[in-house]
Structures are given as structure tokens and as C-alpha cells.
Amino acid sequence: MMELELRNVSYQYEKDTFSVQKVNWKLRSGEIHCWLGRSGSGKTTLLQLAAGLKRPTSGKVLHQDVPVEEPLSDIGFVFQDATLLQWKKVIDNILLPIQLKRKITEEDIAYAKALLKMLQIQHLFDRYPSTLSGGQKSRVAIARALITKPTLLFCDEPFAALDLMTKEELQNELLYLNQSKNIAMLFVTHDVSEAAFLADQIGVMEKGAFIYRQQAPDWSKVNSHRRDTPLFRDYCLEIRQSLEETAHA
């Protein structure tokens, strides 16, 4: 089982200025965690620390109980801007992380096509990014993040610029990927309903620390679509109230 841990982690940009303060956090295989908070609360910096993209000023980042000294190799990233290479076809954009490391094989191409099919965009494999919609570009970015078969997927505001219907479709697809492939996922988002729908655990950050953490309700007891239930609406309300408390702190 994969395990990623932040142990008493702090990060200091300048003297006496901490963007992350003494954070303890743990993510395991198959879990989805979402971090919420105002801009500048430390969410993205903490994600970079967890991924090994930054070194903590104090504390430890542990992957499989081993200190992280460099960027993690078994991790995929999805950002708000898909940053697809406009002169490369969809299939080539997806295969790019492999191409940067070694020669592409027929097995790699077959897996890329399988990801396209899973994300319902198999008909786009030979198209160029300029011909794609925002939702299609996001699906390509997800496939590219998964092509190396990572155990971790980190997403920083991946669907912020998309319309509600497309956003919910992609959330459904990521939830399916999480459950079918047992991938651990971390989301940084401002969208309360997105966090409530996806996350096993939600954390609200303020001034570089978690001021609220909450385990998700037991959705297995919900017979209908979870977004349509009173339990989901009440859960979103609870999270929003915690965010409002940070605004007045």
C-alpha cells in the first residue's frame, strides 16, 4: 500500500514568514483528499511540498516511510491549464511523459488508447489541441497524467474554468478512476461541492495550517445520486460554514 506523509512540516519563504506551519497529514492508496482555503492560505505550497517539488524548512515528507529528497517519480499532475503542445496530436501529448524518459513502445500506445477510451475521447486521438473544447483538453491532461501508471494523482484547480455539466462529468470519471485503479488523489480547490463529492477527507487551510478537517459521510448508505441527497447538501453547508469562519478569523 502506498503511503505519503507530512510530519510536522513547515515552509518559510522569508525570515519570520511561514506559508506552511507544522502540518501533519497522511494519504494512502485509494483515498481522495481535498484541500480548501482562501487564496494565499498555503494550499498550493503544501501540495508542492507533498510532491517533493519544494523542500520543507522543518519537518519531514515521507513516501513509504522514506524521506523525500527529490520530486516523486510515481505521481501525475493535472492543473487548471492543460498546457498541451499545440503542434502535437492528442495521442502524442499523452505519451509525452514517457517520451521524455525513453523510447515509446507499442504497449505504451495501446495503454494511451485505453485511457482515451476510459475517458470517452478515443475518437480524438489524432486531433490537435486547437480543435478541442475545454472539457476535452482536461480529459487529455488527465490521460497524460495517468500514462506513467502513477500511484498518486495531484490536481490543482483542474476544472475551475469549465462549465458545471462538464465539471461534474469529469468529477464522476475521476471518482471511477480512483475506485477502479486504487490511485490516491489530492485536490486543491475552491469548489466546496467538488470537494464534498470527491473527498474521503477534507481539510480547510488558513495561514498555512489546517483549521478544519472532516471525514466524508458514509455514501454507501445513500441509494440515489449523492449530489441529489439532503446529506450532501448538509455536508456542503457544514464545509461552507467552516470557510466563513476562516474569513472572519
Name what the model sees in each region.
Residues 153-156:
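Catalytic Walker B motif of ABC-type/P-loop ATPase nucleotide-binding domains
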Residues 59-71:
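Conserved ABC transporter NBD signature motif
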Residues 128-132, 136:
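Conserved ABC ATPase signature
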Residues 51:
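Helix-to-loop junction immediately C-terminal to a conserved catalytic motif
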Residues 106-124, 176:
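Conserved ABC ATPase "signature" region
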Residues 147-151:
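A short, proline-enriched helix->beta-strand linker immediately N-terminal to the Walker B motif
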Residues 36-38:
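The feature captures the beta-strand-to-loop junction immediately N-terminal to the Walker
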